[in-house]
Amino acid sequence: MIIVTGGAGMIGANIVKALNDMGRKDILVVDNLKDGTKFINLVDLDIADYCDKEDFISSVIAGDDLGDIDAVFHEGACSATTEWDGKYLMHNNYEYSKELLHYCLDREIPFFYASSAATYGDKTDFIEEREFEGPLNAYGYSKFLFDQYVRAILPEANSPVCGFKYFNVYGPREQHKGSMASVAFHLNNQILKGENPKLFAGSEHFLRDFVYVGDVAEVNLWAWENGVSGIFNLGTGNAESFKAVAEAVVKFHGKGEIETIPFPDHLKSRYQEYTQANLTKLRAAGCDFKFKNVAEGVAEYMAWLNRK
C-alpha cells in the first residue's frame, strides 16, 4: 500500500494520478474534506481507501499497524502563505509531520514530503542549505523548521527521507485553493467571464520559477523508485515572468488584453519578487527530468481546464 496525505489536494491528487498511471491503485488517501469540494480531485482516480486526517494522525501517534506500506507521500499541510495563525501552522505543518516521519523511520518506510521555496524568503541563491534560508511568513517558517528537523535526523535514517522545496506549482486539480490557486487559474477564469486578464503593476519584473504539477508528481515518483534521500529544490531551474503566464493564457483563448491593477499593500515586504530553483543538487542525485516551460505547461493546463 502507498499512503498519500493531502491526497485530495492539488499535488497529492496528481501524485495519486501518477501512481495510477504506473498501475498502482492500492493507495490510502488521507485528507481533511471539511471543504467538500475537494472530492472532485479524486473522482477520476482509483484509490483503495480514504482516512480523515485527524483519525490518521491518531493512529500514527498510537503506533497502530497500518499494514504493509511501500511509501508515504506527505503532501498534507496548510499551504496558505497568508495564514498567520502560528499555532495552527506549527501543529498542522510541523508537529503532524514529525509524528509521521518517526512512524516511517521506525518501520523503515520511505518518506517523501512537501517543503517549499517559501523557506528562502527574499534570499536569492536558492541553495538547499540553512545559510541561504530566511522565511518571510509563518507558513515558510513551519516548513523551514521541519527541514531543519529532517537535516538533524538524516544521518541516522535507515530508510529514504526526501523533502522537495516546491517552487510555484500550477496545473490541474487546484480549483479548491481559492486565492492561493495559481495565476494561470485566475487569469483563465477572468477570460471566461469576458474580462481582460489582470496582473499586478510591475509584474513584468516579478520572475518566478513556475513548475507544472504533473512534473512535480513525476519527480516524486522518481525519488521513490530510486531510494533518494535529502532535501531538494523542485522547480524548472528557469525563472519566467507573470506576463509570460498571462501571454500563454491569452494565446490559448485567442482573446484578451493584459491589464494591470495596483499591487496590494498587505503583500508588500512579504512577497517573493524572484524565485529560481538551483537544480545542482537534484541533478547530482541523478534526476535528468526535462521540465515543461511556461508556454508548454500553461498550454497543457488550459486544455485540461477548458476540456468539454
From Swiss-Prot:
What EC identifiers does the entry list?
5.1.3.20
What is its EC class? isomerase
Copy the pathway line from the protein's UniProt record: Nucleotide-sugar biosynthesis; ADP-L-glycero-beta-D-manno-heptose biosynthesis; ADP-L-glycero-beta-D-manno-heptose from D-glycero-beta-D-manno-heptose 7-phosphate: step 4/4
The protein's matches in SUPFAM superfamilies, at most eight in alphabetical order, are given as: NAD(P)-binding Rossmann-fold domains (SSF51735)
Needed co-factor(s): NADP(+)
UniProt GO MF annotations: ADP-glyceromanno-heptose 6-epimerase activity; NADP binding
Could you provide one GO biological process annotation from this protein's UniProt record?
ADP-L-glycero-beta-D-manno-heptose biosynthetic process
| Catalyzed chemical reaction(s) | ADP-D-glycero-beta-D-manno-heptose = ADP-L-glycero-beta-D-manno-heptose
Q: What does the record note about the cofactor?
A: Binds 1 NADP(+) per subunit.
List, from the UniProt record, the residues annotated as the active site of this protein. Answer: Y139, K177
Give binding positions for NADP(+).
10-11, 31-32, 38, 53, 75-79, 92, 143, 169, 177
List positions binding substrate.
N168, S179, H186, F200, A201, G202, S203, R208, Y271
> Which UniProt keyword terms apply here?
Carbohydrate metabolism, Isomerase, NADP
Source organism, top-level taxon: Bacteria
Domain observations: Contains a large N-terminal NADP-binding domain, and a smaller C-terminal substrate-binding domain.
Instruction: Please give the function described in this protein's UniProt entry.
Output: Catalyzes the interconversion between ADP-D-glycero-beta-D-manno-heptose and ADP-L-glycero-beta-D-manno-heptose via an epimerization at carbon 6 of the heptose.
The family note in this entry says:
Belongs to the NAD(P)-dependent epimerase/dehydratase family. HldD subfamily.
Subunit-structure text: Homopentamer.
Q: How is this protein named in the record?
A: ADP-L-glycero-D-manno-heptose-6-epimerase
Species the sequence originates in: Mannheimia succiniciproducens (strain KCTC 0769BP / MBEL55E)
Recall the taxonomic lineage recorded for the source organism: Bacteria, Pseudomonadati, Pseudomonadota, Gammaproteobacteria, Pasteurellales
